[in-house]
Amino acid sequence: VAKVVNAALGRMAVPFFACVTGYFLTKHEKKDSRGWIKNIKSLLSYYVVFSVIYIIWGFTQHEFAGLSAGDLIYTIVKRFVMYGTYYHLWFFPCMILGVVILHFAIKWKREKIFWIIGILCYVFGACTYTWYGIGEHFILGLDRLMQWFDFTYIHRFTTAILPFTFLGNYISAVEN
């Protein structure tokens, strides 16, 4: 039972959250073009609080020991913008980017293009998850790309956030 909860149900939370965000943001964008800013402010308010907590935690665990002041600032900023300040906060920067992309897709009336891009991203992501290893046989150089640390976070965005944000957008569009 624990395996089912962790491997299946637990992995649906972030895509579900992205889908719901895409759905409601699409509805709000039609009424108030500043809805995306409110959404980002809300995400940032939680993200900043949890980031401060985990940065302090990192200091107590000597995670930053030996870093110069410049390297320390660079590390914290890069984590905040790209990875999440702690490994399980990765979805905050990804979701913020998803909200920004959705806003401009709606504003420039390019949602249908992003529905296709979202599907392609999802297929690419499904082929590149390491426990399947399918993509390594068909996509040249993928094994090297997957060893690049940043790829994990790009992969999560293109697989769990962008496609599902635009799925929510699609559901909202079909509903209206």
Across the structure, where does each feature detected by a protein language model lie?
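Membrane helical hairpin/interfacial module
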Residues: 2-67
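Short intrinsically disordered, low-complexity coil segments enriched in acidic
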Residues: 2-5, 164, 176
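Hydrophobic alpha-helical segments with transmembrane-like composition
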Residues: 10, 17-18, 24-26, 54-62, ...
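Coil-to-alpha-helix initiation sites in intrinsically disordered, low-complexity, charged segments
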Residues: 35, 68-72, 140
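Membrane-interfacial loop-to-transmembrane alpha-helix junctions, especially the N-terminal start
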Residues: 34-43, 111-118, 176
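Membrane-interface interhelical loops and short amphipathic "cap" helices
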Residues: 1, 138-146
